[in-house]
């Protein structure tokens, strides 16, 4: 937060108004109060029960030993209750500091009005007649900047003072767990490896939930409220990626990066869904890569949906610092402009003010559209049908890409709205070949996936069939580990639930190679389960190496049921690098799919068929048989929409 002094009031004010606010702090204060009450009640009850036992019928050395052992626990509970009360008070103090700062910063609408007014004065300052008014607006803007910085400095000081009052928690008493299969101390639950966890199958400390952490490279994860996270201090599930690394301080699910609020974001400090980059507010924002359009770069600081670039406000813009819808270029204010620093609708060129102008530095009305072959109003591209399109071959409103059907798409061959990637069916997808909503990964079928090739929702990991997985190759949900068939596993290649160990068949195991429940030691043999042939397998009747689930045939990273290949999850898939149900491959280029009943290469969705796939095949949506299609029931190549035959 200390970087606020360098940030303009647009950023400081907007962050204060669009952030989570004081509600999480107040909720935390209430939770700490409740915990303090429970701890004090537990201490009182514990002391009363032990006193009655030792002073009643139970006498002798055993009774005395029990009383001596119980005393420290009662004292620890009392002290912990006092610390919880202090945490509640300081959380309320921090909430009060935020509310005071929120009241003190300039409202974002006031800042935006100042900037727009200044811009209008500047573009109309042909003879310098607006210079005094521009200077006055800039002076007001500088005052806004100073006001926000002063308020944020006070907020930082107050919140830091509140945090400084918190004392370190006293060491807990060792070797006390409530549950089975735990390795560590003071866990309430089963199958945890670590300390102070409330839940099942965690690898780390002080998690409230299950399946956090990953046994892959020993990625310990702590202080999460949720399940299936790789990282620390997340409020949600499925954040992080086993290959990219831990993600922390997220509020939401399926994010890769830090301090995101929402789902399926790749990057840091995003607010929304499916953003690829940093500090975006909205859905499906990313950055264009002009040298290789199929591989987008991160987009930063966008507010809106489906923008490809940086600092845009609106939807479907390609470029930087545009305000409006469907612009291509930089610094445009309006809709459907191609070029830079235009004000209006459907202009082609630079520094124009008006509608449908072609050229530069013009003012007026040039026609309903600029560009060629357009039907509608405010289009500046080529061959568009609709309104305010600056791209080519689009059907809809505010598209700056190519061959889109829908609204505010800055990518190409999308069906839907707010897609900045390629060949997506849905809305708010930042990368390519997704079917669904808010995916910043690629080739996903579902919602809020920042990873790739997932069938399900809010997966930060890759090639999962299920939801809220930060690991890879899982069939199930809430897994931080890899290649599991089941739920809440932070270990590897388990069939079952809440295992922090590896290659187990069952539940709540912190050891390895066990068949059963609640084991903290290692079993014997190369496999767990029943009827497996090979090594490193768990489950039932698998053949090969490194499989979990049942009746899988193959080597490495197969989970689920009746799959064959490599890196496969789900049910009855017969092609590698695939998640979902009943997907198949044909030809040399096959796999890399998600969804249901697809055949071919690089597909997502339902029932898509590419009979002769090659390395240019890519399809999303429903029932398509063409190449690089989005939408539904298309049989020709390179189209979006529906029923192109």
UniProtKB/Swiss-Prot annotation:
<comment type="similarity">
    <text>Belongs to the mycobacterial PPE family.</text>
</comment>
<dbReference type="InterPro" id="IPR002989">
    <property type="entry name" value="Mycobac_pentapep"/>
</dbReference>
<protein>
    <recommendedName>
        <fullName>Uncharacterized PPE family protein PPE12</fullName>
    </recommendedName>
</protein>
<dbReference type="Pfam" id="PF01469">
    <property type="entry name" value="Pentapeptide_2"/>
</dbReference>
<dbReference type="GO" id="GO:0052572">
    <property type="term" value="P:response to host immune response"/>
</dbReference>
<dbReference type="InterPro" id="IPR000030">
    <property type="entry name" value="PPE_dom"/>
</dbReference>
<dbReference type="Pfam" id="PF00823">
    <property type="entry name" value="PPE"/>
</dbReference>
<dbReference type="InterPro" id="IPR038332">
    <property type="entry name" value="PPE_sf"/>
</dbReference>
């Amino acid at each position: 937060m200390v970087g606020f002094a360098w940030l303009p009031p647009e950023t400081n004010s907007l962050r204060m108004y669009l952030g989570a606010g004081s509600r999480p702090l107040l909720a935390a204060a209430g939770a700490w109060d409740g915990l303090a009450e429970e701890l004090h009640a537990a201490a009182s009850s514990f002391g009363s029960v032990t006193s009655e036992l030792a002073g009643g019928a139970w006498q002798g050395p055993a009774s005395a030993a029990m009383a001596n052992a119980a005393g420290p626990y009662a004292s620890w509970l009392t002290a912990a209750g006092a610390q919880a009360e202090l945490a509640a008070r300081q959380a309320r103090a921090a909430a009060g500091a935020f509310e005071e700062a929120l009241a003190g910063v300039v409202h974002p609408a006031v800042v935006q009005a100042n900037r727009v007014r200044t811009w209008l004065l500047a573009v109309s300052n042909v003879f310098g007649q607006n210079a005094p008014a521009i200077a006055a607006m800039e002076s007001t803007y500088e005052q806004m900047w100073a006001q926000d910085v002063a308020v944020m400095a006070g907020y930082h000081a107050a919140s830091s003072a509140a945090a400084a009052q918190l004392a370190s928690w006293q060491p807990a008493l060792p070797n006390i767990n409530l549950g089975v299969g735990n390795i560590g101390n003071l866990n309430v639950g089963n199958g945890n490896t670590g300390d102070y966890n409330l839940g099942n199958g965690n690898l780390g400390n002080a998690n409230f939930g299950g399946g956090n952490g990953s046994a892959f490279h020993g990625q310990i994860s702590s202080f999460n409220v949720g399940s299936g996270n790789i990282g620390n201090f997340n409020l949600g599930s499925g954040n992080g990626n086993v290959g990219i690394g831990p993600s922390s301080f997220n509020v939401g699910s399926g994010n890769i990066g830090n301090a995101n609020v929402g789902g399926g974001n790749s990057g840091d400090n995003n607010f929304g869904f499916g953003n690829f980059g940093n500090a975006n507010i909205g859905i499906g924002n990313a950055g264009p890569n002009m040298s290789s359009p199929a591989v987008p770069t991160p987009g930063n600081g966008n507010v809106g949906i489906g923008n490809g670039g940086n600092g845009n406000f609106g939807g479907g813009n390609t470029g930087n610092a545009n305000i409006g819808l469907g612009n291509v270029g930089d610094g445009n204010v309006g809709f459907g402009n191609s070029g830079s620093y235009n004000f209006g609708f459907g202009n082609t060129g630079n520094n124009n003010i008006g509608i449908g102008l072609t050229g530069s530095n013009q003012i007026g009305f040039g026609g309903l559209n600029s560009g060629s072959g357009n039907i509608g109003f405010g289009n500046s591209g080529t061959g568009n049908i609709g309104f305010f399109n600056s791209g080519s071959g689009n059907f809809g409103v505010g598209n700056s890409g190519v061959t889109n059907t829908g609204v505010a798409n800055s990518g190409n061959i999308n069906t839907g709205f707010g897609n900045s990637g390629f060949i997506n069916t849905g809305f708010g997808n930042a990368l390519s070949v997704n079917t669904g909503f808010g995916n910043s990964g690629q080739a996903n079928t579902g919602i809020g996936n920042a990873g790739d090739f997932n069938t399900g929702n809010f997966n930060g990991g890759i090639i999962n069939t299920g939801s809220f997985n930060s690991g890879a190759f899982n069939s199930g949900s809430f897994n931080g580990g890899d290649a599991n068939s089941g739920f809440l596993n932070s270990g590897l290649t388990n069939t079952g639930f809440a295992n922090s160990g590896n290659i187990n068949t069952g539940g709540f195991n912190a050891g390895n190679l066990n068949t059963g429940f609640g084991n903290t030691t290692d079993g014997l043999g190369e496999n767990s389960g029943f009827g497996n042939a090979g090594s490193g397998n768990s489950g039932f009747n698998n053949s090969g190496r490194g499989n979990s689930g049942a009746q899988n045939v193959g080597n490495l990273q197969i989970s689920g049921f009746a799959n064959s290949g490599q890196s496969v999850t789900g049910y009855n898939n017969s092609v590698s690098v695939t998640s979902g149900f009943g997907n198949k491959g044909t030809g040399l280029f096959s796999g890399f799919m998600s969804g249901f009943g697809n055949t071919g290469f690089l597909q997502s969705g339902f029932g898509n068929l590419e009979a002769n796939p090659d390395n240019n095949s890519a399809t999303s949506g429903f029932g398509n048989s063409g190449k690089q299609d989005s939408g539904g029931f298309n049989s020709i190549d390179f189209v979006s929409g529906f029923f192109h035959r």
